[in-house]
Regions:
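N-terminal Rossmann-like dinucleotide-binding module
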Residues: 1-48
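Contiguous beta-strand/loop segments that form the cofactor/metal-binding neighborhood of enzyme cores
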Residues: 181-267, 308-318
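Rossmann-fold dehydrogenase core element
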Residues: 107-124, 142-149
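Hydrophobic residues in well-ordered beta-strands that form the structural core
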Residues: 94, 119-121, 255
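C-terminal glycine/acidic-rich active-site capping loop/insertion
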Residues: 124, 220, 243-329
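C-terminal helix-rich "cap/oligomerization" subdomain common to oxidoreductases
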Residues: 1-5, 68-70, 264, 301, ...
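Predominantly a Rossmann-like dinucleotide-binding segment in NAD(P)-dependent oxidoreductases
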Residues: 125-208, 214, 348
Length: 353
């Protein structure tokens, strides 16, 4: 740990912002100097109640002069907030997606390079031991791959309020899809070349052109294909709401959840329960050469534990001077695929990358 903790300004106190703030609160290398939220947050955790709270981001940035700014606001504010923070001398943690457009995402990366600041994007699955195991096991199979992934959420109450708020600017396949496209890209290492998307507005009161259910296919230059689906709202089915399959000619790797997991439970979105590794090899009688393997992942970090890991990674990236070039470029690449999927939904045309 550094002798003097890094001063952090936390911007955005929604579901993710609070989790990140609690991570800074418990980390010896960070000191929260202020919180920023456009309105007075309700039910703020007791651990955060004593910190100064402001409503104006620019004024708070000038007042507190932080070493680090943590941004968990609406996606369309990410780029401007991040660039302003780095111009003021702060390192930045920003929730995914990095920005609302690919051009803005590249602008943020360019600012990190210009100001020589660290930029970490909130790809929480990169800090999850079970997901890194999934990636390792899938890579052992060799490509080309078929990716089948989704995350549908039968949301109501506060969860539906959060989803409707996000959909003022960002569709489900962009907001959630960047996580799983990032996983696909880590497994295949191939270049995505085309995206085809479809979506349906199943909920009333959505902004013009917005949809709460969507799915897309992404094609890679090694022959791999990926499918991702995301739907939010009280109408969503919980049947097969969490599919995580990677298939190749040599077998498959799948996440198998515990029965009874709820689709709107944020911990269920990252917990894996068990990983099933299936081998395709057959003997002379066309019988399996190797039995399926079950990797038990119970006891893994919960959602708060994963946020703690993310912020520890940020701390080490700053204090140990990590080269984050690949990290930043990957964030832009996964966003590019999901933005193309959103464009395909809206135009009805496949998008070449």
């Amino acid at each position: 740990m550094t002798a003097t903790p890094l001063k952090v300004l936390v911007v955005g106190l929604g579901q993710m912002g609070r989790s990140h703030a609690l991570a800074y609160h418990s980390h010896e290398g960070f000191e929260i100097v202020g919180l920023v939220n456009r309105s007075a947050p309700s039910n703020l955790p007791e651990d955060l109640a004593s910190y100064p709270l402001r409503t104006d981001y620019a004024a708070a940035l000038a007042e507190f002069k932080p070493d680090v700014v943590s941004i968990a606001t609406h996606t369309n504010t990410h780029a401007d907030y991040a660039v302003a923070a780095m111009a003021a001398g702060a390192h930045v943690f920003v929730e995914k997606p990095l920005a609302a457009t690919v051009a803005d995402a590249r602008r943020v990366v360019a600012a990190a390079e210009e100001y020589k600041r660290k930029l970490v994007v909130g790809y929480i699955l990169r800090h999850h031991p079970s997901w890194t195991t999934l990636i390792e096991q899938a890579r052992k199979l060799g490509g080309p791959y078929v990716f089948r992934m989704n995350l549908n959420q039968q949301s109501s109450g506060a969860a539906w309020d959060i989803h409707r708020s996000i959909m003022q600017t960002t569709s489900p396949i962009v907001d959630c899809g960047v996580h799983y496209v990032d996983v696909m890209c880590q497994i295949t290492d191939a270049t995505p070349v085309e995206v085809r998307g479809m979506g349906v507005p199943l909920a009333k009161g959505l902004p013009e052109g917005m949809y709460n259910y969507g799915h897309f296919q992404v094609l890679f230059d090694d022959g791999s294909v990926g499918w991702y689906e995301a739907g939010w709202g009280p109408m969503m089915s919980e049947t097969a709401f969490f599919v995580k399959d990677v298939i190749s000619a040599n077998g498959s790797v799948s996440i198998v959840m515990d029965q009874g997991a709820a689709s709107a439970d944020i911990n269920a979105h990252t917990q894996t329960s068990r990983i099933l590794v299936h081998h395709a090899g057959l003997d002379a009688d066309n019988k399996p050469l190797k039995a399926d393997e079950w990797l038990d992942m119970h006891g893994e970090p919960d959602h708060q534990g994963l946020c703690d890991r993310e912020q520890d990674y940020l701390y080490r990236a700053i204090t140990e001077d990590y080269d984050l070039t690949r990290h930043m470029n990957d964030a832009v690449a996964s966003l590019n695929i999901c933005i193309a999927a959103d464009e395909s939904v809206r135009t009805g045309q496949a998008v070449k990358l």
